[in-house]
Amino acid sequence: MAIELPVGKKVTVTVPASSANLGPGFDTLGLALSLYDTVEVEVTDHGLEVEVFGEGQGELPLDGSHLVVKAIRAGLKAADVQVPGLRVVCHNNIPQSRGLGSSAAAAVAGVAAANGLAGFPLDDARVVQLSSAFEGHPDNAAASVLGNAVVSWTEIPVDGRTEPQFKAVTINVDSRIKATALVPDFHASTEAVRRVLPSDVTHLDARFNVSRCAVMTVALQHHPELLWEGTRDRLHQPYRADVLPVTAEWVNRLRNRGYAAYLSGAGPTIMVLHTEPVDEAVLNDAREAGLRVLSLDVADAVSVKVDA
């Protein structure tokens, strides 16, 4: 029988944003970034209360359909505990539907909050599994759970009945590497952006991406001078250019100037990885074009503070 947690127990979760793919690593590479959502979760005597401040305020649901709430419930079930009621307060800094892992961060925050309330019975691998299940792929969620950069993959059981297993290992990123995000003022639908991808690619393009993905793992760890080459891609970004023309224009413009720029996740955010600051004139041009400029560091793992 599940243990009922005491009323008044509270946790505060701080979860980082993430950038997925990093160019060639489609649904594989992820990077945690120093832009954070904070979620406070308290056990109450009955019902459900949800508040949202910041990004998504007035747009996100305030009931059990909120992704954080769904993830909390999944985490509580996995930990074999239950609660009479919940109060959930979300302070969001991660832009919604911009390719910065906002939905993965919500899932991670919920599972991590439940884990903290239950006394941390779930290890990192289980938190990655539960939070990735909401996404269907682990690159963003694993980065937010584990911090730094991750190489992630999905194992499909041969019996066809067991749920997919989402796995990840971390890459310790060279401390010289920083990130600059150029965030457009419009949303991108992950599903819509995925629909433009072909069902098949050439062996030549597959080989190209395998090599660049390998280069990227080395670039992140020890050789940041290889970031430009390591962010080259032929599997997804060329096909998405027509549906994200502003993003494609800026990625090409930056890469032509030697910057390791790529489409972050499903977009529309443009991400630049660098060891030297991006030219201020370029950033001013981006601002004048309506892009929000965010200077970011590589982030550590999600953190959970038990308040009571």
From Swiss-Prot:
A GO CC annotation given for this chain: cytoplasm
Top-level taxon of origin: Bacteria
E.C. number: 2.7.1.39
Keywords: Amino-acid biosynthesis, ATP-binding, Cytoplasm, Kinase, Nucleotide-binding, Threonine biosynthesis, Transferase
Classification via NCBIfam families: thrB
Family: Belongs to the GHMP kinase family. Homoserine kinase subfamily.
Full protein name: Homoserine kinase
Native species: Corynebacterium diphtheriae (strain ATCC 700971 / NCTC 13129 / Biotype gravis)
Lineage: Bacteria, Bacillati, Actinomycetota, Actinomycetes, Mycobacteriales
